[in-house]
Amino acid sequence: MLDETVRSKYKVVIGLEVHAQMLTESKAYSSDANRYGDAPNTLVSPITLGHPGTLPVMNEKTIEYAIRLGLACSCHISEKQYFARKNYFYPDLPKGYQITQDKTPICTGGQLIIRDKDGNEKPVRLTRIHMEEDAGKSIHDIDVYDTLVDLNRAGVPLLEIVTEPDIESSQEAYNYLTEVRKLVRYLDICDGNMEEGSLRCDANISVMLKDATEFGTKVEVKNMNSIRNVQRAIEFEISRQIETLENGGTLSQETRAFDALKGITVSLRTKEAANDYRYFPEPDLPPLHIHQADIDKVQASMPPLPRALFEKYTQTLNLSEYDAYNLTDSKAIALYFEQVILHTSNYKAAANWIMGEVKSYLNEQGIEIEAFPIDALRLAGLINLINEGKVSNTIAAQRIFPAMLTSAESAIAIAESLDLIQTTDNNAVEAAIKLVLDSNPAEVARYKNGEKQLIGFFMGQFMKASGGKVDPKTANQALRNALEQ
């Protein structure tokens, strides 16, 4: 474990490169299907395999998705771009090159704002967002002796999101990746599943003494299949680099892989320079021209974004930052909440129900909100039933909500059928209080002798006697009045 005093001497500098597979029906430059989970090497064609004489055709949806992400990150959308070939030889790259954007990325600049657990915000600047195609996948753990190659992924369209070196800790990297995943899901351009490889991250990490004027030696870390593993890999690499320098060693610019089982990084190769890839213009694709009308069309179709919803919930609906952050963590949850508040003005209650009972049920059943059996209108009806004083929150949660999970009836219909509507009949309230007090004379005497905490006992007995059909606040006050006589 690295001593905190030693660590505090150094500044950590991190830049992240995120590759997001786009949710298009077909691949970037061919009509091959873009799907995950099919049998190996079944989603390929002569174009994917790089056969002589085949020509790429641009998938226009990838341009729309790139613009969508660029707008969400306040990037500059380039008017004219050229494509390039990135050349290298590897078994899972049948063409021997990837089509990418080298000197003219579709998006430049921009930023993504991250939040820490205390609500503090920090902008992470973006260098660029560019389009490219994915390589195939080498599989090392099926055959003992051979590496197998699946080319289904080859040619899948990617967006590479490159940050400036603004990230200063593993926790900030975690927060940034969480925001990226949330954003691409809101935009419907990537499913964000790191476990399936549709969102991948490479981290460039260096350390420098706090009074130094030049960055330290950069090390790239790959092979991280979850946001948590990115955080673990960065944390290990920071400690490794500082310990090496403190022991008088030197660092090499290299690429390292993260071993999730051991929690360490291991050296893969000396880091390549850009000229090692021999970039040159892609001769088979014309320049891409993007006009303001194209950008305006995408802008008009943009969905609500998490930051805008967060500001709406905190500033307009007066929800806490905690509630707003949790509601916007999932696009589907946020959209469900939006539907609920169309039918009720008690925004806080709507948030509480969704983050409480609704999410608990989803977690217990292992389902998403899309499969939740209570639609937004019916949940709003339940909330309104409580607001109107017709049922208590306890009765709603314990009796009506469970019944709604297995019925298509409204909350009011279920409450009436189960005889749960709260009574306002004073005679019935007085009769229930008399029954409770007459049945518990010893507890009444103790209460009158100063054991005021027994009010909880009397409340429990009263709610049983009344069948929970009296407003708890009304019942509490009526009980206190009777006990003080």
Task: Enumerate the language-model features and the residues they cover.
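Extended, structured, electrostatic nucleic-acid-contact surfaces
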Residues: 307-314
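Basic, nucleic-acid-interacting segments
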Residues: 1-304, 321, 342-346
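Strongly charged, low-complexity linkers/loops
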Residues: 370-380, 390-464
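Amphipathic alpha-helical segments in well-ordered regions
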Residues: 69, 237, 340, 353, ...
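Structural motif
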Residues: 318-319, 341-350, 388-391, 449-452
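Short, amphipathic C-terminal "tail helix"
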Residues: 452-485
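Extended hydrophobic-aromatic, low-complexity segments
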Residues: 288-289, 324, 336-338, 349-350, ...
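Core structural elements
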Residues: 197-209, 314-336, 347-364, 377-379, ...
